[in-house]
Regions:
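Short alpha-helical elements
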Residues: 1-294
């Protein structure tokens, strides 16, 4: 019987061929534990927000599940899964190009997230396609803002609420400084003969800066960003399109239902981002399942 948080077998079959072969884990010894069981254990961690040691025994030893999560982060498996799913959704016409939305959200960090070395002796990386690659920052993307100790998550989604890219910074950093960075981390592969950038890009007043508007103009994208009080009024502002921006806030709300994302427990930023990729994979699979006609 399938338990809560576990992946439906029909959706599992879509990504099973993309995972490393269970008998080839890169070293000597016994074959890997069953991928499906391990993945369900990782999904349980994502949704429950519990410590690794509290993982139910039905998913195997917690060390095994934790090691598999880290191995797939280091070899780029998580990022490749999300990239493949987004490309599959793109081919089916499920990704909108009319309006993309950018936003940032403060994530409170638990005291357990503090204490990692500022300069770890060995490289900590999130591997995968170029847009997903991340080197562990010295700050571990942790800092103090008005919301307290935490991380700021910058993200971009399309007009159906499908998350396309993510980046993390210390909580006190302003979102306007990382607009181009999060856009560069969009994981949708470019297909020849198809427009890549959207017709419109929506953001709140925090993105009303000259360098952002220049970037949008350079890429042929219309900005749907309200001006601040100290700026000239934008007579071409599309108020009706701006109302659609709430899709990114609804998407953030869905992801924050995953307790491991709503509060940061990971000491390393690369592990926290990897959990976001796991959540993106799960949500993309749901969209893919809804789009199935066979």
């Amino acid at each position: 019987m399938r338990r809560r948080y576990e992946l439906h077998p029909r959706l599992w079959k879509k990504i099973e061929p993309l995972l490393p072969h269970p008998t080839h884990h890169g070293g000597p010894g016994r074959p890997w534990h069953d991928h499906y069981t391990i993945l369900n254990g990782i999904l349980w961690m994502l949704h429950s927000g519990a410590p690794w040691r509290d993982l139910p025994e039905r998913y195997g030893p917690w060390q095994t599940v934790y090691d598999r999560f880290n191995r797939w982060r280091k070899d780029g498996t998580w990022a490749r899964l999300v990239t493949w799913l987004l490309d599959h959704l793109q081919r089916r016409g499920c990704l909108g190009r009319d309006l993309w939305c950018v936003d940032a959200s403060i994530i409170r960090a638990s005291h357990a997230a503090a204490g990692a070395k500022k300069n770890p002796g060995r490289a900590r990386v999130l591997a995968g396609p170029k847009a997903a690659q991340l080197q562990e920052p010295p700050s571990h993307a942790l800092g103090y803002s008005q919301g307290g100790f935490g991380t700021k998550v910058h993200l971009v989604c399309e007009d159906h609420g499908i998350l396309l890219g993510i980046y993390v910074t210390p909580g006190q950093r302003h979102e306007s400084q990382f607009f181009e960075t999060v856009i560069e981390r969009v994981l949708v592969p470019h297909r020849r003969g198809q427009r890549y950038w959207p017709e419109r890009m929506a953001g709140d007043k925090g993105y009303s800066y000259r360098h952002i508007r220049r970037w949008l103009k350079r890429h042929g994208t219309r900005g749907v960003i309200p001006t601040r009080k100290n700026q000239p009024r934008d007579l071409g502002f599309e108020k009706a399109q701006y109302r659609r921006r709430n899709i990114v806030e609804r998407a953030i709300g869905w992801y924050k239902e995953c307790r491991h994302l709503a509060t940061r427990y990971d000491k390393l930023a690369v592990n926290y981002v990897a959990f976001w990729l796991v959540a993106m994979m799960e949500r993309d699979l749901r969209f893919l399942g809804l789009s199935d006609t066979d």
